[in-house]
Amino acid sequence: MRVLFTGAECAPFFKTGGLGDVLGSLPNQLAKEGVDVGVVLPLYQDLPEKYRKNLKYQGNFIVPVGWRNQYCGIFTLKLNGVNYFFIDNEYYFKRPGIYGYYDDGERYAYFQQAVIMMMERFDFIPDVLHCNDYHTAFIPFLLHEKWGFVDAYKGIKTILTIHNLEFQGKYNAKTLPDFFGMNYDWFDSGIVRMDNDVNWMKTGILYADRVTTVSPSYAREIQTVEFGQGLDAILRMCSHKLTGILNGIDFEKYNPKTDPVIKKNYDVYHLHHKSKDKIALQKELDLPIKPNIPLIGMVSRLTAQKGCQLLLDELDNILQFNVQIVILGNGDPYYEHRLMEIAERYPDKLKVILAFDVKLAQRIYAGADSFLMPSAFEPCGLSQLIALRYGTLPIVHEIGGLADTVWVYDETTNEGTGFGFKEFSGYQMVQAIKKMLALYQQKNNWLKIQKIAMKSDFSWKNSADKYKWMYGELIG
């Protein structure tokens, strides 16, 4: 079985969010299980030198982008059993960062066509071509309608994974001829059109053999008006081929027993050592050293989607409890400013670090008692999975992947892995925090829940097994 992944980002080369984590982990796990795996990526300027120096040049060809003939060089790298192909074009990709350029539409139109043309030229014809998010969502359509005449491509099955439906790739109708050399008939017929734009995501949903998203709950939610981002009717129409498969986390990387950046390593059988990480975190952030005070951590982009307004509305009230809170992240300047203002008023209770700091994040996962994740919507979420792995009990809005991965504590059975609130309101969030604080005082019960949380299996093996089954079903 040969599977070719493609997307706009992939750890460890370049990553801005969950898409990069998935493309950095799922192919690796599949390779461990004997699948012949490739990943095609743009060769961005920011590729770290330790990888760039090992790239092997394989050749080049021309990609027509409308009336323009654009160079495409192919470089390869084999890492952890995965074949990586890098699409080289300095005009499109020799720039800082990944996204946010005025010509992103043209850049990823070029990239998608380069991916398709590369497969035959460099003899990597997959059984399954696995596309990710809008940057590659037009590929199933192009493969079928523009390159359908290529015999080598006729057996390829396509999967489109939606990591975040908010971003859809909406472009003017003139981009059909200008980027793809295709006529307006496809637009006029409505096949690629949505709200008078070409919509790559909508088209990919229609043309892909299977559509997946990153949790079962999110797969259901995006078929509703509330969460469907205008594509709910299309997704309901395609519900027969829509599946939610949870993301995983790297159990080797996120392991409190071996994590090199935390103060004291621990596991489910030596949870008493976790308190040393808490004290170390309090020292590092200049909080009063109080091992018995509940410490809530939050590692997040500071945006409305992540529930920051909800948090701001209730933060003064929460800080009246006997609690310490540590928030790490950056994002919307308004939320950054407001959080810093509140932190100045509560120097012994609240620390806000406006940064993206992977090592400090690890120390927060290890040192906190509980982890707050009040997202307005969350396709899957990785932070709550890491928190569970570290025995740091999540407090979550029961939505999307958060609902699928956090087993909300039941006081009658004394079982669960965290705390939740169904209604997206400040009052309900505070009630969930109060339940956490009450359980924290019951040390034996708290320890029991921590152990259940740490034994939860959200490794990539579970996800990879589900995808392998889907690939097998597709190719027969």
UniProtKB/Swiss-Prot annotation:
Pfam families documented for this protein: Glyco_transf_5 (PF08323), Glycos_transf_1 (PF00534)
This protein's name: Glycogen synthase
Keyword terms, alphabetized: Glycogen biosynthesis, Glycosyltransferase, Transferase
Statement: the UniProt record of this protein carries the keyword Transcription regulation: no
E.C. no: 2.4.1.21
Chain segments annotated as coiled-coil in the UniProt record: none
GO MF term list: alpha-1,4-glucan glucosyltransferase (ADP-glucose donor) activity; alpha-1,4-glucan glucosyltransferase (UDP-glucose donor) activity
GO biological process terms, semicolon-separated: glycogen biosynthetic process
Organism classification: Bacteria, Bacillati, Bacillota, Bacilli, Lactobacillales
